[in-house]
Amino acid sequence: MSVHIEESPTTDGDVITNYTINFGPQHPAAHGVLRMIMELDGEIIERVDPHVGLLHRGTEKLIEHKTYLQALPYFDRLDYCSPLCMEHSYVLAIEKLLNIEVPERAQYLRVLFAELTRISNHMLNLGAHVLDVGAFTPNLWMFELREDCMNFFERASGARMHMAWFRPGGVHQDVPEKLLVDIGEWLDTRLPELFGDAMSLVLDNRIFKQRNVDIAVVSKDDAVKWGFSGPMIRAAGIPWDLRKSQPYDVYDRMEFDIPVGTNSDCYDRFSVRVKEVYESAKIIKQCLAQMPQGPIASTDGKVSPPSRGRMKQSMEALIHHFKLYTEGFHVPAGEVYVATESPKGEFGVYLVADGTNKPYRCKIRPTAFSHLQAMDFMSKGHMLPDATAILGAIDVVFGECDR
């Protein structure tokens, strides 16, 4: 017995199948060079296949052919939205292998600028996120604040983005006192005003909530299984923060809260980052209040360069300077893994030294890679426009992801 199927006037008798589209790598919401191959059933996402590696530059291999100091600028170019936090893991790993003391002032300066970097990074991410879901104005205000952060970086190191300011043994140069005063004033005036205005347009906005609430809900167990870290795992309600659980530099002296979410959706991830901006401001204020006077780099002449004045008067200082910038310092054989709380999550550096002046191996543990691999898991069953909100909430930068 044959069943007669009436031919559909719309499909002309064809069987409707899922169709496959490319999202990126030229898509403005793809945040760089991400290509996602999506399988759609109408407008419902069935499968997402992220193709990464389009920004692969062989960083880990390049580092093996450079001295420890020459390898430092490569870290600025990993997550180029938060360069100082990339350097932080690397210099801490070298210091652990060298077993050297970092002066207190240098530690305070590092923590201060790491938190300023966190604010700068969140300004970019939160601004891009609201832009992705259709709000325009808040992004402009947050870019103003990011520009302020860039100006502070420039006044400290001479460069706006790729600072290379954290060095093994401390920081490269001391900051002018006026800069610290200006940062303190900025935290009390411009930051709360502009950021508060921007968030007042977004956080209680009905359209923004419709685009983010209950999108990409991830349970606590799943967040741990997928290897989430940073705001992604804190949004799931797990108060995991390396600055508290494994404090480095002077974070153990800082008083701050760990913002956590309850619903673990895109809105919670956004909210956690918003609260983190205020917590970072709290930490910076404590640094400004507690920061002592003193040296800003290790006194070991074999690791930190002498001042220019000493170099022009002392033969010994000149020799140290010459050796340091030609041959570099030798690091005793050993291996170490150091992770720091970057704005995007846990950024780790696994450094293997063989006793020479170059790293034998430097494995970089990126933050965004583990978040991006859950893209299929988070997007399934959602609509196509939700993918941009999910990607915005992940906060992915491909310099770091592809290495």
Curated annotation (Swiss-Prot):
It comes from the Bacteria. Coiled coil: none annotated. Its EC number is 7.1.1.-. It is an enzyme of class 7 (translocase). One of its GO terms (molecular function) is NADH:ubiquinone reductase (non-electrogenic) activity. Keywords: Cell inner membrane, Cell membrane, Membrane, NAD, Quinone, Translocase, Transport, Ubiquinone. GO terms for cellular component: plasma membrane. The keyword Transferase does not apply. InterPro entries: NADH_Q_OxRdtase_suD, NADH_UbQ_OxRdtase_49kDa_CS, NDH1_su_D/H, NiFe-Hase_large. The keyword Cell membrane applies. Belongs to the complex I 49 kDa subunit family. NDH-1 is composed of 14 different subunits. Subunits NuoB, C, D, E, F, and G constitute the peripheral sector of the complex. NDH-1 shuttles electrons from NADH, via FMN and iron-sulfur (Fe-S) centers, to quinones in the respiratory chain. The immediate electron acceptor for the enzyme in this species is believed to be ubiquinone. Couples the redox reaction to proton translocation (for every two electrons transferred, four hydrogen ions are translocated across the cytoplasmic membrane), and thus conserves the redox energy in a proton gradient. This is NADH-quinone oxidoreductase subunit D. The lineage of its organism: Bacteria, Pseudomonadati, Pseudomonadota, Alphaproteobacteria, Sphingomonadales.
